[in-house]
Design a protein with these regions (language model features):
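ABC family nucleotide-binding domain
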Residues: 1-220
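C-terminal boundary and immediately downstream tail of ABC-type ATPase nucleotide-binding domains
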Residues: 217, 221-244
Length: 244
């Protein structure tokens, strides 16, 4: 589903991604973790070309993201992306946020888009908030609407860029529960997160990044209990004992 080959990304003289090669198979849940500034968010944002790469190739759903002539809108339509900051349209209701793209990009008729959106809002536990505007929703509710909106395009792949980082701690669980449900349903997902308990419970594989490189790839049990790379070992020690 996702193939990343020899990808490099620069910000001026700063080498943000260094020769990254990785793949995510259909139905696989891959969690990307690491310290701040390690390149996690940059990597996931290159997958749907929110960030452009300097070299290498990225292929999603059989489409080369960086090939000349790639229709970027059509390419992105096959990838759901959930941001840190929700990015809902403030002047649209929860329902309207979930119907806009299917109607404009997929040509869905309004009644069909409405029916689909209501089903998705129900799936994330927010059918009762269909007519609410984002300003009337909590952060956790806004992020669940954002997930429903991403699902409205029926993407085979979902990307999450630290989806709980902007939430109050008590709101985190409701968003992670929705994501866990997607994993159970077989959605292909690539997730950047600091929620290590979630990664342990849901991921098929964990990628650990630091300084623009993937330093370790492992099953969750191996990564959390038997990390091989010294930097991963230090990272896990630090998050387990933050005041020592």
């Amino acid at each position: 589903m996702i193939e990343i080959q020899n990808v490099n990304k620069w910000y001026g003289s700063y080498h943000a991604l260094i020769d990254i090669t990785e793949s995510v198979g259909a139905g696989e849940v891959v969690v990307v973790c690491g310290p701040s500034g390690s390149g996690k968010s940059t990597l996931i944002r290159t997958v749907n070309r929110l960030e452009e790469i300097a070299s290498g190739t990225i292929t999603v759903n059989g489409q080369n993201a960086n090939a000349p002539g790639t229709d970027i809108n059509r390419f992105r339509a096959g990838i759901g992306f959930v941001f840190q900051q929700f990015n809902l349209f403030p002047h649209l209701t929860a329902l309207e946020n979930c119907t806009l793209a299917p109607m404009q990009l997929r040509g869905l008729k309004k009644p069909d888009a409405h029916e689909q959106a209501m089903a998705l809002l129900d799936r994330v536990g927010l059918a009762a908030k269909a007519d609410a505007y984002p300003s009337a929703l909590s952060g956790g509710q806004q992020q669940r609407v954002a997930i429903a909106r991403a699902l409205a395009m029926s993407p085979p792949v979902m990307l999450f860029d630290e989806p709980t980082s902007a939430l109050d701690p008590e709101m985190v669980g409701e968003v992670l529960t929705v994501m866990q449900g997607l994993a159970r349903d077989g959605m292909t997902m690539m997730i950047v997160t600091h929620e290590m308990g979630f990664a342990r419970a849901v991921a098929d594989r964990v990628l650990f990044m630091d300084q623009g490189r993937i330093l370790e790839r492992a099953a969750p049990d191996d990564f959390f209990n038997r990390p091989q790379h010294a930097r991963a070992q230090q990272f896990l020690r630090d998050i387990r004992t933050p005041f020592n």
